[in-house]
Amino acid sequence: MQKTLKKNFTLSGITLHSGEISNIKVNPAPANTGILFKRTDLKVPHIETLLNAKIENVVFSELCTKLSNEYGHSVSTIEHVMSAFHGLGIDNAIVEIDKAELPILDGSSLEYVSEIERAGIKNLQAKRKIVNITRPIIFRDNDSYIKVTPANNMSINYTIVYDHKLINEQNFIFDLDSTYNYRNIISNSRTFGFKDEVEYLRDKGLIAGGSLENAIVLDNDGIMNQSVLRHDDEFVRHKVLDFIGDIYLLGHRVKGSFEIFKGGHRLTHELVKSIMSDKSNWNYDYDKSDLDDLTFSTLDHKKELSASL
């Protein structure tokens, strides 16, 4: 069955790139809404404030995932909340936001997970569609690549390589088969960066809100944070966290076996585009836990969505 929240929740915090305080309100949504972002700060017609979290709305942005609608309005750094939605099985939600960027919080998805669980999750009377990969697909960029092959569930095999003694080469294998696994194995892994890149990125107008409170920062000696790593392989686990958020831009959960080598946001976006570009790459399946053939009528769905917005 499709799922949403039982009630709304709010969060506030500094944004990673613009350095502003951003306030969000995450609301339940009716079946077949998907994940929808709504800019509450814009003084424009209502329809122009909405951004659907699907690959066709993704635009290029360094170091994060950014959506833009046909009216030129955007919202960025959505990957962590998208990861939490995917990891906890939330199919439908409306995220109201009063800035163009989501708060970075502690650099992981843990706070989103905690708030979703506190709000509660409820079933909706509609079957959950799943994107089922039907043939191998690969996207390469120099020595980086990402590929997917057909499978009965969603599995991730992720490898990162960095010239730093705390990272070197890290590999992590993860099956997105339970909310417990996502919460306890992935959700608290923080974003990371390198001290010698900070000045360069800030000169480009990025990471204005970055600090040791919301990212792991590495110098030549190790990590600069007073806190210790949450996992020895926290770096690659965070990459898995980002991937779980970005692959959800398919608009549905997915069945496929993913192998990623030296990946990132853009590589995942390109794979999603490749998947959706040819209907022979995939078909729709249904969650096997859905025993009843229950759907909202189009009219009921439109009425509920209108009321939610």
Residues covered by each model-derived region:
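C-terminal regulatory domains involved in ligand/effector binding and gene-expression control
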Residues: 1-91, 96-309
